[in-house]
A protein has these predicted regions:
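Conserved small-residue
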Residues: 1-198
Length: 198
């Protein structure tokens, strides 16, 4: 491992708090994520959703640099990856930590994969003439919130790839995704909450 990633004996606790990302990587954690933003969960199906505003840098194959772990090696068009996406992680029990000890929880993310992905604007799309990502798909998701009652994942954008940031509603039961709100130019959709029965 590179010299700058060594931890002096007895300083593990300090390292864990002073530079959690690097120390986690030394311990085997995946550290290549770029622009990881909102997190929410679906308790009925035991799924965790994570907004990845941009997919670049260490997440892309052969772009990891000197990081001690290289768990993520995505391939694909950089213009598509630049539009970000929502990742989904099933949660389950029976998982071990990096020391081989059983984690005493049934809510451990065991794997993660792309779920709802943005993509570059297709040639000939006339809607959203200033958008660089497909106007009919999410772009650079930032804030997310899951509603158990509605079985719906709400996704707020913070994107320079859509002129207007959108709020999307994705039904996890039927897979339908609809745009429900367009913010004014430069307006970020943040602080998402679901308040049933108003």
């Amino acid at each position: 491992e590179p010299l700058y990633l060594r931890v002096k004996p007895g300083m593990e606790m300090a390292a864990a708090f002073l530079d959690s990302r690097k120390y986690g990587a030394i311990r085997g954690a995946t550290s290549e994520f770029t622009k990881m933003e909102g997190v929410t969960h679906n308790p009925q199906d035991k799924q965790l959703f994570v907004a990845m505003s941009m997919i670049e840098g260490g997440m892309v194959a052969d772009k990891n640099g000197r990081r001690p772990q290289d768990h993520i090696r995505l391939e694909g068009d950089a213009a598509d990856l630049n539009c970000g996406g929502i990742y989904r992680a099933p949660m389950q029990g029976g998982q071990m930590d990096s020391d081989g000890s059983l984690i005493a929880s049934e809510w451990v993310a065991a794997s993660m994969s792309g779920y709802l992905m943005g993509r570059r604007k297709p040639a000939g799309q006339t809607v959203g003439p200033y958008d660089r990502c497909d106007t009919d798909r999410i772009a650079n998701p930032d804030n997310i919130k899951y509603s158990s009652a509605m079985r719906t994942l709400f996704i707020g954008e913070d994107s320079s790839n859509h002129l207007n940031n959108f709020l999307w509603a994705h039904n996890v039961a039927d897979g339908e995704t609809v745009r429900v709100l367009s913010a004014p130019i430069g307006g970020e959709l943040t602080g998402l909450q679901v308040v049933p029965d108003i």
